[in-house]
Every structure is written in structure tokens, then in C-alpha cells.
């Protein structure tokens, strides 16, 4: 559903339903079924040099199995906000800000895989922050087109789902708290070689530092 109460403001609402099932020939299979409801509300405001987008997504799941226990019903709101600013209308220069709350539900393998699965897993959660700049230009003397982007980001991840070694076998577990920071840079350009031939070039660079904050006594803390 799309609604525009003002020329600069657009509102939308979307609803999805998903059913997932796991079936195999192993006698230990619990034959789980997951019902998921996803509701998304979005708002977009654009006026002059400013564009702002906000969203709120609600996810609710319920699982049933023919054998054994299942995780508790789950629901979570995940907000996000992004802002783009173009200070000069005659220049394709944009400054960007973004915040996003995300999560990852345990998969059927994480929960029910024979001996490895753990039905008490919690969803993996992350808070993501990003600051970026984009610049592009057309019709230069050497380049038909050139584009440069630079982004810095910071992620805070908790309840990370990992395969954790135990005495006799591996086991899925919520283990870990990670802070990750990094920089992404890209460059793309188009150079005319002849009237009908263009050379397209692109490249990227990524630097990232991830810190494990799970155990202050561990060597990799």
C-alpha cells in the first residue's frame, strides 16, 4: 500500500507471509515447520537537498515440529534510518548517514541438525552504522564518466551463532560479541577509446578490523 500525504512525503506498508518446512528420510528428523510474518512500514521524505528514509520491520515466527521441542515464538521490531544530503544542486556530491538494526534467525540446520543442532539458540543481532560520501561527474575531457565512493562503518554483533566444539562433537551455540569497523572505497570510470568503443574501469579497496569481545581473558580479546 502506497500513500503520499504530501508532495515531499511518501508512506508505504507491506505485508508478507512465509512457510518453511524441513523434510528428509532420517528417522531422527523432527519435521519442523516455521510460519513467518513480516510487516514493513516505510517513510521517505525528499525536499531540495535532503532525502531521508525510515523503516520499521516487524518479524514474528512460530515453529511446530512432529517430534521434540521447538523454540519459543519470536517477534522483533527492526528499525532503520538513512539520510542523504546534496549540498549543491549542480554537483553530484552526496553525503550519507545510515543506521540499521538487523538480526538473523537460526536456520533449520542450526536448530535441528542431528547432534549438531541446538533448539535453544537465540537470534543473532547486529547494530550497523555507516557514514559515506559519493561523487560522480560526466563529460570530462578524459573521462565520459567517473564515480568515487568512500564509506566508513561500525558494526556491533551479539549472540553470534557459531559451531562450537564440545568433548565429542560440535554444537551450535550463541557465542560471541564482536565489534567491527572498516572503510570501503570504490572508483569507477569510463574512457572513450574510439567513437564506438568505451573502456570501463572499476576498482575497490576494503579495510576492516574486527575485535572479539566475548572473553576478556582470551588471547584474541
Please place each PLM-identified region on the residue numbering.
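Transmembrane beta-strands of outer-membrane beta-barrel pores
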Residues: 17-23, 47-49, 56-64, 85, ...
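Outer-membrane beta-barrel domain signature, especially the mid-to-C-terminal portions
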Residues: 26-33, 67-78, 105-125, 155-179, ...
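Membrane-embedded beta-barrel scaffold of Gram-negative outer-membrane proteins
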Residues: 88, 95-98, 104, 124-188
